Amino acid sequence: MQRASRLKKELHMLAIEPPPGITCWQEKDQVADLRAQILGGANTPYEKGVFTLEVIIPERYPFEPPQVRFLTPIYHPNIDSSGRICLDILKLPPKGAWRPSLNIATVLTSIQLLMAEPNPDDPLMADISSEFKYNKIAFLKKAKQWTEAHARQKQKADEEELGTSSEVGDSEESHSTQKRKARPLGGMEKKFSPDVQRVYPGPS
């Protein structure tokens, strides 16, 4: 089956040579169900955010484009509240620009570029597009707030958990007559790094 063989090659390349700030893998050994993560670019309102996407590969791939949507909420004129993305290579001609020579890495890289350079003239969210055009400061503020609230949520939870552990430790020490040496806390969050390579299972 062409889809399976093509996917195997593409996932192998994504594993050994991932585009900067992008990672992709198969979800629960399902051939057509992939997940991807894109690291928000520097000097953008999405900086330091990790955005998860769902990538569904149709049976006629690569003659049909993958179906991609954001699972992580993002404030962006070309991405709606359900995660749908307005991008030409995600649609077939004549309305779109998908062609079989493109691949998953190309799609994810294009989405990463769209995050850095929104296209307000072809929006899915008209109100956000208008804000981007005419009130850029307000747009940047809201986009950063969404990134903090949704794309960095795990980091905040880990920090809160570590803070709670420290408070408990301080309380116990205040009631103790002996001085104890502090132990290093485990369970620190693993930072997302585009250089980290993952092992991706091939299709069965």
Curated annotation (Swiss-Prot):
Species of origin: Mus musculus
Keywords, sorted A to Z: ATP-binding, DNA damage, DNA repair, Isopeptide bond, Nucleotide-binding, Nucleus, Phosphoprotein, Transferase, Ubl conjugation, Ubl conjugation pathway
UniProt keyword Mitochondrion, yes or no: no
GO MF term list: ATP binding; chromatin binding; ubiquitin conjugating enzyme activity; ubiquitin protein ligase binding; ubiquitin-protein transferase activity
PTM section of the record: Auto-ubiquitinated. Effects of auto-monoubiquitination at Lys-91 and Lys-181 are unclear.
Recorded superkingdom: Eukaryota
Matches recorded under InterPro entries: Ub_conjugating_enzyme, UBQ-conjugat_E2_core, UBQ-conjugating_AS, UBQ-conjugating_enzyme/RWD
Protein's GO biological process: DNA damage response; DNA repair; protein autoubiquitination; protein K11-linked ubiquitination; protein K27-linked ubiquitination; protein K29-linked ubiquitination; protein K48-linked ubiquitination; protein K6-linked ubiquitination
Purpose of the protein: Accepts ubiquitin from the E1 complex and catalyzes its covalent attachment to other proteins. Catalyzes monoubiquitination. Involved in mitomycin-C (MMC)-induced DNA repair: acts as a specific E2 ubiquitin-conjugating enzyme for the Fanconi anemia complex by associating with E3 ubiquitin-protein ligase FANCL and catalyzing monoubiquitination of FANCD2, a key step in the DNA damage pathway. Also mediates monoubiquitination of FANCL and FANCI. May contribute to ubiquitination and degradation of BRCA1.
A Pfam family matched in the record: UQ_con
Protein name: Ubiquitin-conjugating enzyme E2 T
Catalytic function, reaction form: S-ubiquitinyl-[E1 ubiquitin-activating enzyme]-L-cysteine + [E2 ubiquitin-conjugating enzyme]-L-cysteine = [E1 ubiquitin-activating enzyme]-L-cysteine + S-ubiquitinyl-[E2 ubiquitin-conjugating enzyme]-L-cysteine
Residues in cross-link Glycyl lysine isopeptide (Lys-Gly) (interchain with G-Cter in ubiquitin): 91, 181
Subcellular locations according to the entry: Nucleus
Keyword Protein transport listed: no
Active site: 86
Disordered: annotated span: 150-204
Top enzyme class: transferase
